[in-house]
A protein has these predicted regions:
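Binding-site signature for planar aromatic cofactors or substrates
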Residues: 1-182
Length: 182
């Protein structure tokens, strides 16, 4: 199967929108390789070679740190039900924190969610699909709400302290969120 495309087609964008999650892979020189799962409700296809997602506060900051150091990123979407398929978007990512250039332009594209820390914008240079025959079929039970309820319970002040503690540098000591982050 494995085809390569120059642009994200409307059909591919619709298919992406039906997937409940995606995976983000990044690496910086001489650092650990990182792969993180993300929920799709925060992901947007902004154009044929441009995507972004609203990044929520987590216990690590590897994706942000790696993008600041290197910029390379791969996003992977898998069909867990229906016809088997894997779609990968290869590109270069930019971190847009509140107050950064481009953040205010992108922000209206996303829902208001507690704990947002940045928008990750990706310029996609390669789109490739593959058969997905090795991806298991799974039934989605539903989203987990623990991240959102925990963030709401802590409130903005405690979340800012948490980000200072957990999100200012990666596990390899690379810079994560900037000091201006609320």
């Amino acid at each position: 199967m494995g085809r390569v495309y120059e642009n994200i087609s409307k059909e591919q964008a619709r298919w992406i929108g039906k997937q409940p999650m995606f995976f983000v892979a990044t690496a910086a020189p001489d650092a650990h390789v990182n792969v993180s799962p993300r929920e799709l409700d925060t992901f947007r296809v902004l154009g044929p070679n441009r995507v972004a997602w609203l990044d929520l506060t987590g216990s690590g900051v590897e994706t942000i740190a790696h993008l600041r150091a290197d910029g390379r990123i791969t996003l992977m979407f898998c069909a867990f039900e229906g016809l088997p398929k894997i779609l990968r978007l290869y590109g270069r990512g930019e971190v847009r924190e509140p107050g950064d250039a481009g953040y205010d332009e992108l922000r209206p594209s996303f829902p208001d969610l507690p704990g947002e820390r940045a928008i990750i914008e990706v310029s996609v240079g390669r789109i490739a699909d593959s058969c997905g025959f090795g991806v298991p079929r799974m039934d989605l039970v539903g989203p987990r709400d623990k991240l959102l309820t925990s963030t709401e319970r802590k409130g903005p002040e405690k979340m800012a302290k948490y980000r200072t503690l957990k999100n200012t540098q990666s596990i390899d000591g690379l810079p994560g969120l900037g000091p201006k982050h609320p």
